[in-house]
């Protein structure tokens, strides 16, 4: 879904081509080079430097803070590097509290949504990157790595949430906060930035953006169009309301937004065939691709994702694409084929 400025906002993805390792590597590589798409930049809005979430499920924090950094840059001309770990610290405690309150019926995981970042800024403020320990450094790494962190934290939260006790104590919160602080750092009450002292709240207010100016927009038919509803996915655990508009209007909003200089925090799905870590997702017509690639249905479904991507990439610009419809989008959401597994910052066309 999209966290968007009320008036306008953003979009675009870029694609490279992935290569594959197989007996036909040379042949496939030649085909890829011949058919490689060439992209023309139509619009590229200003963004801050790209950060690496590494082995942490914090795409929602990195992408949405990047979005807000772009908003600040557009509005004030100033470049900031805001702390993802500050937002993660606050959000994980809130999510654990909700999981316990709901006796485990709200999931507890590394993931989140763009709204989690907006909520954190509104309720807890924000700090610059250097006001917290650098991601990964508290565990001897140079980048965030949440493997051990959540191996410890998840069963801790589940033990409390699924407790058979008739009454639980409040001690679990201080214990959990200690775990969070140990792995990603304590959140400061005060800090100095460019010679001036701030609290997280006063620093957030100094950034020059109005946090009430942002909304979430989506498009599904199981709720009335032009109404608001909470999108039913696990990482949308705060249940914020999204404006529901037809898919065609959603696309128009994006096109209009990016061409007017805005960017967007986008929550989407990168698990479909045709989306690789090195490229842009292309909505391939899989039935036609199977035929063009000389692969029958049974063999196609037995191929690994990387093997499928090699075949898809070899077709390149000749690969047939579907024309997405509102019904396709809805069907894929209803049957779990499409979900909300990755947050991105879209900034151009």
PLM regions: where:
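Catalytic-core signature of thiol
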Residues: 26-349
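Sec-dependent N-terminal signal peptides
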Residues: 7-16
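Boundary at the C-terminal end of the N-terminal hydrophobic targeting segment
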Residues: 20-25
